[in-house]
Protein backbone atom coordinates (compact mmCIF):
# COMPACT_ATOMS: atom_id res chain seq x y z
CA UNK A 1 0.00 0.00 0.00
CA UNK A 2 1.50 3.24 -1.20
CA UNK A 3 0.96 6.80 0.01
CA UNK A 4 -0.29 8.66 -3.04
CA UNK A 5 -0.83 12.09 -1.46
CA UNK A 6 -0.70 14.04 1.80
CA UNK A 7 -2.74 17.17 2.52
CA UNK A 8 -2.93 19.62 5.42
CA UNK A 9 -6.30 19.74 7.16
CA UNK A 10 -8.08 23.06 6.67
CA UNK A 11 -9.31 23.38 10.26
CA UNK A 12 -6.08 22.19 11.90
CA UNK A 13 -2.82 23.02 10.19
CA UNK A 14 -0.92 20.64 12.47
CA UNK A 15 -2.78 17.56 11.20
CA UNK A 16 -2.37 15.82 7.86
CA UNK A 17 -4.65 13.59 5.81
CA UNK A 18 -2.94 10.52 4.40
CA UNK A 19 -4.21 9.05 1.11
CA UNK A 20 -3.25 5.51 0.17
CA UNK A 21 -3.84 4.26 -3.36
CA UNK A 22 -5.72 7.49 -4.14
CA UNK A 23 -8.16 7.05 -1.23
CA UNK A 24 -8.21 8.76 2.18
CA UNK A 25 -7.00 6.30 4.80
CA UNK A 26 -6.15 8.14 8.03
CA UNK A 27 -4.87 11.41 9.50
CA UNK A 28 -1.89 12.11 11.73
CA UNK A 29 -0.35 14.81 13.87
CA UNK A 30 2.61 16.73 12.46
CA UNK A 31 4.94 15.09 15.00
CA UNK A 32 3.80 11.60 13.96
CA UNK A 33 4.20 12.52 10.30
CA UNK A 34 7.83 13.47 10.91
CA UNK A 35 8.61 10.58 13.25
CA UNK A 36 7.48 7.93 10.75
CA UNK A 37 8.86 9.91 7.80
CA UNK A 38 5.56 9.73 5.94
CA UNK A 39 5.81 11.07 2.41
CA UNK A 40 4.32 10.59 -1.01
CA UNK A 41 5.46 7.34 -2.56
CA UNK A 42 6.24 5.55 0.71
CA UNK A 43 4.97 1.97 0.88
CA UNK A 44 3.34 0.81 4.12
CA UNK A 45 2.20 -2.56 5.40
CA UNK A 46 -1.04 -3.00 7.34
CA UNK A 47 0.98 -3.53 10.52
CA UNK A 48 2.87 -0.28 9.94
CA UNK A 49 -0.36 1.62 9.35
CA UNK A 50 -1.79 0.25 12.61
CA UNK A 51 1.37 1.27 14.46
CA UNK A 52 1.12 4.79 13.02
CA UNK A 53 -2.56 5.07 14.01
CA UNK A 54 -1.78 3.99 17.57
CA UNK A 55 1.07 6.49 17.79
CA UNK A 56 -1.27 9.21 16.56
CA UNK A 57 -3.87 8.29 19.15
CA UNK A 58 -1.25 8.72 21.86
CA UNK A 59 -0.14 12.04 20.39
CA UNK A 60 -3.72 13.29 20.10
CA UNK A 61 -4.49 12.22 23.66
CA UNK A 62 -1.30 13.84 24.94
CA UNK A 63 -2.28 17.16 23.35
CA UNK A 64 -5.75 16.93 24.90
CA UNK A 65 -4.31 16.08 28.31
CA UNK A 66 -1.89 19.02 28.21
CA UNK A 67 -4.75 21.34 27.31
CA UNK A 68 -6.80 19.81 30.15
CA UNK A 69 -3.93 20.54 32.52
CA UNK A 70 -3.59 24.12 31.32
CA UNK A 71 -6.67 25.15 33.33
CA UNK A 72 -5.42 23.86 36.70
CA UNK A 73 -3.27 21.16 38.27
CA UNK A 74 -4.83 17.70 38.16
CA UNK A 75 -4.27 14.37 39.87
CA UNK A 76 -3.33 11.31 37.84
CA UNK A 77 -6.81 9.85 38.39
CA UNK A 78 -8.49 13.02 37.12
CA UNK A 79 -6.41 12.86 33.92
CA UNK A 80 -7.08 9.14 33.48
CA UNK A 81 -10.83 9.69 33.91
CA UNK A 82 -10.71 12.56 31.41
CA UNK A 83 -8.92 10.45 28.79
CA UNK A 84 -11.45 7.66 29.26
CA UNK A 85 -14.22 10.15 28.49
CA UNK A 86 -12.28 11.09 25.35
CA UNK A 87 -12.61 7.41 24.35
CA UNK A 88 -8.88 6.75 24.44
CA UNK A 89 -7.77 3.11 24.37
CA UNK A 90 -6.28 1.73 27.62
CA UNK A 91 -2.83 1.28 26.05
CA UNK A 92 -2.87 4.92 24.91
CA UNK A 93 -3.94 6.20 28.34
CA UNK A 94 -1.09 4.36 30.06
CA UNK A 95 1.45 5.69 27.59
CA UNK A 96 0.09 9.24 27.81
CA UNK A 97 0.27 9.21 31.61
CA UNK A 98 3.86 7.95 31.46
CA UNK A 99 4.81 10.73 29.05
CA UNK A 100 3.11 13.34 31.23
CA UNK A 101 4.97 12.05 34.30
CA UNK A 102 8.27 12.17 32.41
CA UNK A 103 7.47 15.77 31.43
CA UNK A 104 6.64 16.63 35.08
CA UNK A 105 3.01 17.35 34.24
CA UNK A 106 1.89 14.80 36.83
CA UNK A 107 2.99 14.83 40.46
CA UNK A 108 0.35 13.67 42.90
CA UNK A 109 2.29 14.86 45.94
CA UNK A 110 2.56 18.42 44.59
CA UNK A 111 -1.08 18.28 43.50
CA UNK A 112 -2.22 17.17 46.96
CA UNK A 113 -0.15 19.87 48.68
CA UNK A 114 -1.49 22.63 46.44
CA UNK A 115 -5.08 21.39 46.66
CA UNK A 116 -4.94 21.19 50.46
CA UNK A 117 -3.43 24.66 50.86
CA UNK A 118 -6.05 26.14 48.53
CA UNK A 119 -8.94 24.49 50.38
CA UNK A 120 -7.60 25.67 53.74
CA UNK A 121 -7.25 29.27 52.57
CA UNK A 122 -10.36 29.67 50.44
CA UNK A 123 -13.10 27.27 51.53
CA UNK A 124 -12.79 26.89 55.33
CA UNK A 125 -13.41 23.14 54.96
CA UNK A 126 -12.46 20.80 57.77
CA UNK A 127 -9.61 18.29 57.38
CA UNK A 128 -11.90 15.27 57.07
CA UNK A 129 -13.74 16.84 54.14
CA UNK A 130 -10.45 17.63 52.40
CA UNK A 131 -9.24 14.07 53.04
CA UNK A 132 -12.42 12.66 51.49
CA UNK A 133 -12.03 14.87 48.41
CA UNK A 134 -8.41 13.78 47.98
CA UNK A 135 -9.50 10.13 48.13
CA UNK A 136 -12.06 10.85 45.40
CA UNK A 137 -9.27 12.36 43.30
CA UNK A 138 -7.28 9.14 43.53
CA UNK A 139 -4.59 10.11 46.03
CA UNK A 140 -3.04 7.40 48.19
CA UNK A 141 -3.56 7.31 51.95
CA UNK A 142 0.16 7.86 52.40
CA UNK A 143 0.11 11.10 50.39
CA UNK A 144 -3.09 12.28 52.08
CA UNK A 145 -1.67 11.70 55.56
CA UNK A 146 1.46 13.59 54.56
CA UNK A 147 -0.26 16.71 53.23
CA UNK A 148 -3.09 16.93 55.76
CA UNK A 149 -0.48 17.48 58.48
CA UNK A 150 -0.11 20.98 57.04
CA UNK A 151 -3.57 21.77 58.41
CA UNK A 152 -2.44 22.75 61.91
CA UNK A 153 -4.70 22.68 64.97
CA UNK A 154 -4.45 26.47 65.08
CA UNK A 155 -5.60 26.84 61.47
CA UNK A 156 -8.42 24.37 62.02
CA UNK A 157 -9.76 26.30 65.02
CA UNK A 158 -9.42 29.60 63.17
CA UNK A 159 -11.33 28.36 60.11
CA UNK A 160 -13.90 26.52 62.20
CA UNK A 161 -14.57 29.68 64.21
CA UNK A 162 -15.08 31.68 61.00
CA UNK A 163 -17.56 29.05 59.85
CA UNK A 164 -19.21 29.13 63.27
CA UNK A 165 -19.75 32.89 63.02
CA UNK A 166 -21.49 32.43 59.67
CA UNK A 167 -23.71 29.69 61.08
CA UNK A 168 -24.55 31.86 64.09
CA UNK A 169 -25.69 34.73 61.88
CA UNK A 170 -28.04 32.39 60.01
CA UNK A 171 -29.48 30.96 63.22
CA UNK A 172 -29.78 34.00 65.48
CA UNK A 173 -33.29 33.18 66.68
CA UNK A 174 -32.34 30.26 68.90
CA UNK A 175 -31.24 30.03 72.52
CA UNK A 176 -27.50 29.98 73.17
CA UNK A 177 -27.42 26.27 74.07
CA UNK A 178 -29.37 25.28 70.98
CA UNK A 179 -27.22 27.56 68.84
CA UNK A 180 -24.05 25.93 70.17
CA UNK A 181 -25.42 22.48 69.37
CA UNK A 182 -26.37 23.60 65.86
CA UNK A 183 -22.93 25.09 65.22
CA UNK A 184 -21.14 21.99 66.54
CA UNK A 185 -23.24 19.65 64.38
CA UNK A 186 -22.75 21.74 61.24
CA UNK A 187 -18.98 21.98 61.77
CA UNK A 188 -18.67 18.22 62.18
CA UNK A 189 -20.58 17.81 58.91
CA UNK A 190 -18.09 20.20 57.30
CA UNK A 191 -15.21 17.92 58.26
CA UNK A 192 -14.03 19.15 61.65
CA UNK A 193 -13.45 16.89 64.65
CA UNK A 194 -15.96 17.11 67.49
CA UNK A 195 -13.28 18.68 69.71
CA UNK A 196 -12.53 21.48 67.25
CA UNK A 197 -16.24 21.95 66.49
CA UNK A 198 -17.12 22.36 70.17
CA UNK A 199 -14.24 24.76 70.78
CA UNK A 200 -15.21 26.89 67.77
CA UNK A 201 -18.84 26.89 68.86
CA UNK A 202 -17.90 28.18 72.30
CA UNK A 203 -15.58 30.78 70.80
CA UNK A 204 -18.23 32.08 68.39
CA UNK A 205 -20.98 32.31 71.02
CA UNK A 206 -18.70 33.55 73.80
CA UNK A 207 -19.90 37.15 73.55
CA UNK A 208 -23.59 36.23 73.69
CA UNK A 209 -24.72 37.26 77.19
CA UNK A 210 -27.93 36.92 79.15
CA UNK A 211 -29.23 40.22 77.76
CA UNK A 212 -28.81 38.95 74.21
CA UNK A 213 -30.65 35.73 75.01
CA UNK A 214 -33.44 37.63 76.80
CA UNK A 215 -33.85 39.84 73.75
CA UNK A 216 -34.05 36.79 71.46
CA UNK A 217 -36.56 35.17 73.82
CA UNK A 218 -38.72 38.29 73.88
CA UNK A 219 -38.84 38.51 70.10
CA UNK A 220 -39.65 34.82 69.78
CA UNK A 221 -42.41 35.03 72.40
CA UNK A 222 -44.03 37.99 70.62
CA UNK A 223 -43.79 36.25 67.26
CA UNK A 224 -45.12 32.93 68.56
CA UNK A 225 -47.98 34.55 70.50
CA UNK A 226 -49.14 36.36 67.36
CA UNK A 227 -49.04 33.09 65.48
CA UNK A 228 -51.07 31.28 68.16
CA UNK A 229 -53.59 34.00 69.02
CA UNK A 230 -56.37 32.15 67.20
CA UNK A 231 -56.28 29.40 69.83
CA UNK A 232 -57.92 29.54 73.24
CA UNK A 233 -55.56 30.83 75.99
CA UNK A 234 -54.51 27.46 77.45
CA UNK A 235 -53.74 25.99 74.02
CA UNK A 236 -51.96 29.15 72.85
CA UNK A 237 -49.77 29.14 75.95
CA UNK A 238 -48.85 25.47 75.54
CA UNK A 239 -48.07 25.88 71.84
CA UNK A 240 -45.95 28.95 72.57
CA UNK A 241 -43.95 27.20 75.28
CA UNK A 242 -43.45 24.09 73.11
CA UNK A 243 -42.25 26.20 70.18
CA UNK A 244 -39.78 28.10 72.37
CA UNK A 245 -38.44 24.91 73.93
CA UNK A 246 -37.80 23.56 70.43
CA UNK A 247 -35.60 26.61 69.87
CA UNK A 248 -33.49 25.68 72.89
CA UNK A 249 -35.05 27.75 75.67
CA UNK A 250 -35.63 25.83 78.91
CA UNK A 251 -39.11 25.52 80.41
CA UNK A 252 -38.03 27.34 83.57
CA UNK A 253 -36.49 30.21 81.59
CA UNK A 254 -39.68 30.64 79.56
CA UNK A 255 -41.94 30.53 82.62
CA UNK A 256 -39.73 32.97 84.52
CA UNK A 257 -39.75 35.40 81.62
CA UNK A 258 -43.54 35.19 81.26
CA UNK A 259 -43.99 35.77 85.00
CA UNK A 260 -41.42 38.56 85.36
CA UNK A 261 -42.84 40.44 82.40
CA UNK A 262 -46.46 39.74 83.40
CA UNK A 263 -47.25 38.23 80.02
CA UNK A 264 -50.74 36.77 80.03
CA UNK A 265 -52.49 34.72 77.38
CA UNK A 266 -55.93 35.68 78.69
CA UNK A 267 -55.88 38.77 76.51
CA UNK A 268 -55.85 36.60 73.42
CA UNK A 269 -59.40 35.24 73.98
Curated annotation (Swiss-Prot):
It holds the Pfam family RecX_HTH1. Its main location: cytoplasm. The keyword Ribosomal protein does not apply. Keywords: Cytoplasm. InterPro entries: RecX_HTH_1st (IPR053926), RecX_HTH_2nd (IPR053924), RecX_HTH_3rd (IPR053925), Regulatory_RecX (IPR003783), WH-like_DNA-bd_sf (IPR036388). It is found in: Cytoplasm. It comes from the Bacteria. GO terms for cellular component: cytoplasm. GO terms for biological process: regulation of DNA repair. The keyword Cytoplasm applies. Modulates RecA activity. Belongs to the RecX family. HAMAP family: RecX. This is Regulatory protein RecX. It comes from Listeria welshimeri serovar 6b (strain ATCC 35897 / DSM 20650 / CCUG 15529 / CIP 8149 / NCTC 11857 / SLCC 5334 / V8).
Amino acid sequence: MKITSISVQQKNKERYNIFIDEKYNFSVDEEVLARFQLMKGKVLTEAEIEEIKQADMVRKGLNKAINFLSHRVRSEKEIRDYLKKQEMEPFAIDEILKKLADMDYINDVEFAELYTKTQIKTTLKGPRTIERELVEKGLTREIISQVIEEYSDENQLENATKQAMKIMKRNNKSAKKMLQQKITTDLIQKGYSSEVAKAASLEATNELDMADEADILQKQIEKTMRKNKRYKPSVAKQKTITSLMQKGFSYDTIQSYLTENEISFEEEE
